[in-house]
Amino acid sequence: MAKTPESLESSINEITDRALDRDCTTLSRHVLQQLQSFSPDAQDLSALMNRIALAGKLVARRMSRAGLMEGVLGFTGEVNVQGESVKKMDVYANDVFISVFKQSGLVCRLASEEMENPYYIPENCPIGRYTLLYDPIDGSSNTDNNLSLGSIFAIRQQEGTDSDGKATDLLANGRKQLAAGYILYGPCTMLVYTIGKGVHSFVLDPSLGEFILTEENIRIPNHGSVYSVNEGNFWQWEESIREYIRYVHRTEGYSARYSGAMVSDIHRILVQGGVFLYPGTIQNPEGKLRLLYETAPLAFLIEQAGGRATTGLVNILDVVPKKLHQRTPLIIGSKEDVAKVESFIQNGH
């Protein structure tokens, strides 16, 4: 039965109202809505997410001009604490996060994969109760090729005074994270986050200079066709991982997708389902990815979306690091697909 003009107008108004409500939902407003509170703790978390968003805007602006500016692309000639060659964009993004959080008054320490030790902000430490852990640029090898990149972040509450400057309270499992997420720098700049109340995505509207809500309570499919892994490392892996790769090669319905930027690959899997693997190798069974800056934040987010993250033997969020820059293997994504990889690791099939 055809709708009456009145009911049609009502439907249009309802759609318009929903669109306007979405357009008005900024990141800071959304955090407060999620916490259903204007308590000091809720306002702190909202302010911290605003700072992360500002860092993302600054990095995105720099990237959008990278091909037009001197001194942005290429390597610095230095090596970081991980033994990796440092890109100029790594240094810039790391400095951006430090500068942005110096002004927050809430963060006493920042810990990054680019710095051997945490960066302390003395003027914030008397009142700053939080620590930001982050990977300023994920996939920096993509920078010079104009491909997608990302930033990964987590917020933890400081425990104790850390008077000796060793930050031992950070050596705790991933369930201590208050918030985590990533910023994806692609055709648009997207921020995806969780504070333990689901996973939500925002897109940077350049005309407003604001991250605007695009999707709430994202759920990862239980199974997907995509597997994402650098198959160039095939002969460096344990036989169990090689057997899994042989399995997906001979089984109909699987598609390989690997961009070289973990944030980009995991975002695809969050939306479409599937599994991302960065296993250890025979020579380095602990893997390459850093627990505190990369795997734990992403594990928190994916679990909140209904997925799983594991080393192959242990849930990532249950791993207790022994040192700040501890590495770990990572299998992350849809529940069924992660379970299949685990089965190969634990049972050989």
Swiss-Prot record:
Its cofactor is Mg(2+). Its main location: cytoplasm. InterPro entries: FBPase_C_dom (IPR044015), FBPase_class-1 (IPR000146), FBPase_N (IPR033391), FBPtase (IPR028343), Fructose_bisphosphatase_AS (IPR020548). Mg(2+) 1 binds at E113, D135, I137. It is an enzyme of class 3 (hydrolase). It is found in: Cytoplasm. Binds 2 magnesium ions per subunit. Substrate binds at D138, G139, S140, S141, N230, Y258, K288. SUPFAM superfamilies: Carbohydrate phosphatase. GO terms for biological process: fructose 1,6-bisphosphate metabolic process; fructose 6-phosphate metabolic process; fructose metabolic process; gluconeogenesis; reductive pentose-phosphate cycle; sucrose biosynthetic process. Mg(2+) 2 binds at D135, D138, E294. One of its GO terms (molecular function) is fructose 1,6-bisphosphate 1-phosphatase activity. Its EC number is 3.1.3.11. It holds the Pfam family FBPase_C. CDD domains: FBPase. Keywords: Calvin cycle, Carbohydrate metabolism, Cytoplasm, Hydrolase, Magnesium, Metal-binding. It catalyses: beta-D-fructose 1,6-bisphosphate + H2O = beta-D-fructose 6-phosphate + phosphate. GO terms for cellular component: cytosol. Homotetramer. Belongs to the FBPase class 1 family. This is Fructose-1,6-bisphosphatase class 1. The lineage of its organism: Bacteria, Bacillati, Cyanobacteriota, Cyanophyceae, Nostocales.
